[in-house]
Amino acid sequence: MKQLLCVLLLAGVLRAAEPVFPYGAVYFRKSNPPEEDWARDHATAARMGMNMFRHWFMWASIEVAPGKYDWRDYDRMMDLAAKNGIKVVIAEMVTAAPEWVFDKYPHARFHASDDSVVHSSIGGSSATGGFPGVCLDNEDVRALAERFLTALAARYRNHPATYGYDLWNENSYGGGSPQKMHCYCQATQRKFRDWLKGRYTTMDALASSWGRHSYPDWSYVHPPRNFGGYSESLDWLEFRIDDAFRLLHWRSELFRRVDPKNHIVAHGVAGTLDALPSSANDEWRSAAEVETWGFTWVASRKGSELWKQFHAVDLVRAGSRGKPFWHAEAQAGPLWMQPQVIGRPREDGRISDDKDVRLWNLISCAGGATGILYPRWRPLLDGPLFGAFGPYGMDGSVTPRSEMAAKVARWANSHTEIWKSRPVHGDIGIVFVPESELFAYVQQGATAQYAESARGAYQAFFDSNIQADWVHVDDIAQYKAVYLPYPLMLKAATAAKLSKYVENGGILISEGLPAYFSDHGKAGATQPRLGLDRLFGAKESYVEFTPDLLENLTLEVRGSKIGGRFFLQEYETAGGTAAGHFANGHIAAVENKVGNGRTLLIGSYPGASYFRHHQPEAKKFFAGLLEWAGITQLTTSNDAQVQARLHTGAGGTWLWVVNPTREPRMVTVGVGAEYRKATDVWQERSHRVDGRRVEVKVDDRNVAVIRLE
């Protein structure tokens, strides 16, 4: 192998340097593609501008017996990549455990909340066994996994094709429904008790918080088997999330120790707003562990409305906190018969064409992605996801979709300057508060109310071409104004952060019932509390938790008729000024000045209402919040169906104008400064500039990528 590597090193030297813009796909996952096509497929990929492959290095398919590794197929993949100048991301897959592990270590199988035990299964994306792995809270099997990962990194760390390692595929903890949640094995329960000791210190404190007063000692403490809005449920969810990220950190530290020179990357599913409680999806915590973050997003599963992909890209960019990120699994082929597509039109992401590939690629770039990979280079030939996602044909043949992918790949790698600039800071921030989502889950069994409130607020701004950035509550000082969706539960520490932000000059727009529930899931006897009555200059006079009756709630705020949903809260002023009313004349909104900042409290959930109803007057209201906050909008578009984004930095100023419609559009885009020249490097045309306005023609399902000078 050493002699061959010398030859391969010379052969790949011209393209062995790291790509300007990583572009490629997941290629090998043991069961696919057929071996007789490997060499041809690599040559095709290289010829068409692909510079990166990710392969699934599955523990279950490599360590065929204890300490016995079968690397043959993987060695071939690495050597073919080096020969063709393709870099490889090694996706560690200890989430597929060897069959012998399941039998030799039965205690490490996932134990669910219904007392069922998980057995080895064939994977949905690989026709191989060992899924979903075993519980790595068991130190004996984690030591086995560490032995495998160490051998993996040691074998390939000096290979010329190696780019780095992708950790914990899609950063999602499986087994997340309250009815069948993982893991309740003895090892996990012991770790949970240790976690609780760190939080409560004494048994008396735990008993008081949980309302379980007959524990003789810590060994009697067990995680809850069903959920309510109680302290024990919240503690269990927070522990599961912390435990998942403890294991991600273990992975990252292991690879850094064994191979300090290559890259550490990971990707999730942009699921922070709805899957934090169930699957530990957290863009911020994941991105903190790696050099490059990323995400899976396919329109076939999510829908092709423009705001949806943009909101995902924006979420991943926010979580990355300035680090580079990739669209690590992008769609370029159809999806057959899966439940997410049934009943939807074929044009809604179900059957992709070349223009879809172009549009979806460039939307992610407009949001700041600096790499694109597909979940398949060519489709799988078996399993429930046969024929799905890949740009190439079932036999690896070139298609119009793969030709478009090649065009984007070559273009992106020939324009180094574009990727040196980054998306500008948004007009306003939408605040992510983890406990608000967790509480929705334990109280209602789902995160829909939280997610619809957050996403509805995003849509309301987006529909006016306002760039609303997602912002973690720890980062709100970076924004002049922030919008707080669904703050039904806030911890005391969060309330203090919000108060400090406003005292220091921030502008906080909050939806209703802020901190109605706080630490340990307890409601306050008076509302608002935790000092929020002073912050908002208001006290509650009446409250209603009647979501079935409030679907079409209306209220007037600052002269606009908007909608609410789920709950309502009426107020009396306590230092603030009435800024809106319900239909009965009672106060629905209060403005206040505190320290150097201002607040606006709205007594329901207008974000969730906009998510469902899209009222034109509510759209105007959300847009008007910028003027109320004294903020000048970064970019404007006179066509509501066309979205514009601005990037600035060392690579210059770039205007991205996205047309998702099926017809060309002429749009006037307002920008924040005067320019003399607008050169479109993607559509290869010039656009008319009139000071702070650019007249842009964008072809159907296309994007203008314009250098402004």
Residue locations for each model-derived region?
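An acidic-aromatic substrate-binding cleft motif
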Residues: A17-W38, H42-M52, I428
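Carbohydrate-binding surfaces of carbohydrate-active enzymes
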Residues: R301-H311, L315-E709
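The substrate-binding groove and active-site-proximal loops of carbohydrate-active enzymes
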Residues: Y23-P34, W56-R72, S126-E146, M181, ...
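Short, acidic/polar
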Residues: N32-R47, A145-A151, A275-S286, D353-N361
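Conserved, mostly hydrophobic/aromatic
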Residues: A25, A45, F53, A81, ...
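Sec-dependent N-terminal signal peptides
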Residues: Q3-G12
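Polysaccharide-binding and catalytic clefts of secreted carbohydrate-active enzymes
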Residues: S113-Q309, L315
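Aromatic-lined substrate-binding rim segments of carbohydrate-active enzymes
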Residues: A39-A46, N51-S120, L149-A153, R251-D259, ...
